[in-house]
Swiss-Prot record:
Gene: purL
Residues binding ATP: 45, 84, 492, 529
InterPro entries in the record: PRibForGlyAmidine_synth_PurL, PurL_linker, PurM-like_C_dom, PurM-like_C_sf, PurM-like_N, PurM-like_N_sf
UniProt-recorded name of the protein: Phosphoribosylformylglycinamidine synthase subunit PurL
Active-site residues (renumbered): 42, 88
Record's subunit section: Monomer. Part of the FGAM synthase complex composed of 1 PurL, 1 PurQ and 2 PurS subunits.
Annotated substrate binding sites: 87-90, 109, 238, 310-312, 532
Provenance organism: Campylobacter concisus (strain 13826)
HAMAP family (alphabetical): PurL_2 (MF_00420)
Residues that coordinate or bind Mg(2+) 1: 86, 530
Gene Ontology molecular function terms on file: ATP binding; magnesium ion binding; phosphoribosylformylglycinamidine synthase activity
Family listed: Belongs to the FGAMS family.
GO biological process terms held by the UniProt record: 'de novo' IMP biosynthetic process
Record function comment: Part of the phosphoribosylformylglycinamidine synthase complex involved in the purines biosynthetic pathway. Catalyzes the ATP-dependent conversion of formylglycinamide ribonucleotide (FGAR) and glutamine to yield formylglycinamidine ribonucleotide (FGAM) and glutamate. The FGAM synthase complex is composed of three subunits. PurQ produces an ammonia molecule by converting glutamine to glutamate. PurL transfers the ammonia molecule to FGAR to form FGAM in an ATP-dependent manner.
Coiled coil start-end: none
């Protein structure tokens, strides 16, 4: 094998030596391509696996933790919630519409392949600078519009509501955008399907769309940095067909009602290669596959292309022997391709045939369960010492600061985005995009509700990767708790830069430690997740962005707690300690272009007490609303609530310094109280600091010296974002 071919497959010299040992010979091109895909960062997690070990993954309500297509938790009454978050960062930067659309398609397959009907989508999106007339801003407006259109197109065509998410902007994402997709489905807790292939002689069946050349090398592309040489990689981006996926989902759900199969796996990154090796690897089995039987969309396709294509809307099934025709009939009824392409063996080896000739033979273990794990060098970044001392002037009046922060893209209402998503299809949505807080759906059969919230502050993770990651877990959980639901588990999408940079690996290591700590302390285990590395361009990495989605359950869907005002004259209370924390704050960034300071550790006792107080007060029906205090502090939190509800506020709060209305002290919330005496007694019992700061009502936004027309505040908050994004329209 010539060196140029090996290098083109991103195989290091050490890895090639290991391949020679495994095979006992030189690999052919097909085998090299398979090793390249399965040992890519995207498939093998070779740089991250060391630090993922030790994540809390167990609890009485956890049915399936990491290692399968998606995580599964018990949500009561014999119902299970199946959910996961995935990234499609690199493809979306190259071709935003198809990249984002197929990201949605992939996460949907991960969920419904477990036997669940998907009932909710969410997303977590990061873009660079979108304001102004620079070519960079124009590019990111294009990326934003394309990605959002792709997400909406796929979800809407599938008939699945997109009910929430988060979108933020920072120059650190100028060279790499982050597109993270989340899906949640429901099924019976005793009817879950797994990605395994076992039982010698059991047939292996290919179902779904035909295989083409789209997406070739996608897994390897997603495991590399961007530079001037590889920015035009459109052929590596898959092309999605949501209508084909809708048929595939319905066919799979029909199949799951029968006892015909052993296991089923989505063909995601690395296509037929990853699905076959993962299914056999989990079971310790071997497999024979006859690649000339694979349904092909293009003529002249080779075994190499068939194994590595990432054509969408495809699944691999291990059926029970004797039931293969029943399986084929179901998929053909739905007008999908379905062919028997192989069988399970006991050899522990993958044997690939092309017109009855052996084209490739590889042991399965070293490419699946026993894939290499790297111990990359780590080094604490030098920049941390440079940014540790945050000094910001106190020379800007609060009115000026208020409007400056209100106009920041990450603050502004994102109706331009979520209006492209159908949030109400399936008629289960209780709380949808634009309402603040956790998104919520009802489980009609049980009367319960599932709340879910996405959260991550990249600036906080840049300033302190461990505390920042812990805060993401806590903040996502708090949003769920503020809806009245009990947070139960998380899924994560860990977006970091180039792992070959020791400082990036240190950020990743610290981020994992923060997640472990927070999940243990808050009793929200990790049940699924994804790692996306190489989010860097020309040596510049994105801010560490460990996106978290927390899922929780409210025993009574009728007690879902709102996040905004719904009446006038309601007492408003601020819960938690305000200590003047401006580290990594929007105030420091927007007004002084400074990102730095020292984050305070998460006070888990205070965080848990806040959750428990609001959940209990909601059960006693003494709250009208509850909302987490987040970016921009109390002032921006109240401005959002007033704008959405079209109800003013009149608040006066005694802080040490006037600008503390913008501070981002952690573990705080704003609540509307119906019975003040009862609530204050309850808050005292739980040990949560409280202060009555005002009332809702009127058409003014009043907070200390800020006294503005609510109409003016609403005009900015509700309409400014669309004006920014639509500049070229």
């Amino acid at each position: 094998m010539d060196k140029a071919t090996i290098q083109a497959h991103k195989i290091s010299d050490e890895e090639y030596e290991e391949i020679l040992k495994i095979l006992g010979r030189e690999p052919n091109l097909l085998e090299l391509g398979i090793f390249s895909a399965m040992w890519s960062e995207h498939c093998s997690y070779k740089s991250s696996k060391k630090y993922l070990n030790g994540f809390p993954t167990k609890a009485p309500w956890v049915i399936q933790g990491p290692g399968e297509n998606a995580g599964v938790i018990d949500v009561g009454d014999g119902v299970a919630a199946v959910f996961k978050m995935e990234s499609h960062n690199h493809p979306s930067f190259i071709e935003p519409f198809q990249g984002a659309a197929t990201g949605v398609g992939g996460i949907l397959r991960d969920v419904f392949t477990m036997g669940a009907r998907v009932v909710a989508n969410m997303n977590s999106l990061r873009f660079g600078e979108i304001r102004g007339e620079s070519e960079l801003a124009k590019k990111h407006r294009y990326l934003l519009k394309g990605s959002v259109a792709g997400i909406g197109h796929y979800g809407n065509c599938m008939g699945i509501p997109t009910i929430g998410g988060e979108t933020t902007f920072d120059p650190s994402f100028n060279g790499n955008i982050l597109i993270n997709a989340f899906a949640l489905g429901l099924c019976k807790s005793d009817e879950i399907f797994y990605g395994k292939a076992e039982g010698v002689g059991n047939p292996v069946i290919y179902v779904g769309s035909k295989t083409g050349r789209d997406g070739l090398g996608g897994a390897v592309m997603a495991s590399d940095s961007f530079n001037d040489e590889n920015k035009s990689l459109r052929p590596t981006v898959q092309v999605g067909d949501p209508f084909a996926e809708k048929l595939l989902m319905e066919a799979c759900l029909e199949l799951f009602k029968k006892d015909y199969i052993i296991g089923i796996q989505d063909m995601g990154a690395a296509g037929l290669t990853s699905s076959s090796f993962e299914m056999a690897g989990r079971s310790g089995s071997g497999m024979k596959m006859y690649l000339d039987r694979v349904p092909m969309r293009e003529v002249g396709m080779t075994p190499y292309e068939l194994m590595l294509s990432e054509s969408q809307e495809r699944m691999l099934i291990c059926a029970k022997k004797g039931f293969e025709q029943k399986v084929l009939e179901i998929f053909r009824k739905w007008d999908l391709d379905a062919e028997i392409i192989g069988e399970v063996t006991s050899s522990g080896v993958m044997q690939l045939y092309w017109h009855d000739e052996l084209a490739g033979e590889i042991p399965i273990g070293p490419l699946s369960e026993a894939a290499p794990v790297l111990d990359r060098p780590v080094a604490r970044p030098k920049y941390l010492d440079e940014i540790a001392n945050l000094e910001i002037p106190n020379n800007i009046d609060n009115k000026t600061a208020f409007f400056k922060l209100l106009k920041e893209p990450e603050v502004l209402n994102k109706s331009f985005i979520y209006d492209q998503y159908d949030a109400n299809i399936q008629t289960n949505t209780i709380k949808q995009p634009g309402c603040l807080g956790a998104a919520t759906i009802r489980i009609k059969e049980s009367g319960r509700a599932i709340a879910m919230a996405a959260q991550c502050d990249p600036r906080a993770n840049f300033v302190d990767p461990k505390i920042g990651a812990a805060r993401a877990v806590a903040a996502a959980g708090r949003k769920v708790a503020m809806s009245g639901a009990v947070p139960l588990a998380i899924t994560d999408c860990l977006n970091y830069g180039n792992p070959q940079n020791p400082e990036v690996m240190w950020q990743f290591k610290e981020g994992c430690e923060g997640i472990k700590e927070a999940c243990r302390e808050l009793n929200t285990p990790v049940v699924s997740g994804n790692v996306s590395l190489y989010n860097d361009t020309d040596g510049i990495s994105v801010y560490p962005t460990p996106a978290i989605v927390t899922v929780g359950v409210n025993e009574d869907a009728n007690l879902n707690l709102k996040s905004t005002f719904s009446s006038e004259g309601r007492a408003i209370y601020l819960l938690g300690e305000t200590s003047g924390e401006f580290a990594a704050s929007l105030y420091a960034k927007a007004l002084f272009n400074v990102v730095g300071g020292k984050l305070k550790e998460v006070d888990y006792k205070a965080e848990r007490a806040l959750w428990e107080l609001v959940i209990e007060a909601n059960k006693e029906q003494i709250l009208e609303f509850a909302n987490s205090v987040g970016v921009g502090g109390l002032a921006i939190t109240l401005a959002k609530m007033a704008s959405i509800s079209n109800i003013g506020v009149n608040c006066e709060v005694k802080f040490k310094e006037p600008n503390f209305i913008f501070d981002e002290s952690f573990s705080r919330a704003v609540v509307g109280v119906k019975d003040e005496a009862k609530f204050e007694a309850l808050a005292t019992k739980f040990g949560v600091k409280f202060e009555k700061i005002g009332v809702s009502g009127g058409k003014r936004f009043k907070l200390n010296e800020i006294d503005e027309s609510l109409e003016d505040v609403r005009e900015i908050y509700l309409n400014e974002f669309a004006k920014i994004v639509k500049k070229e329209d």
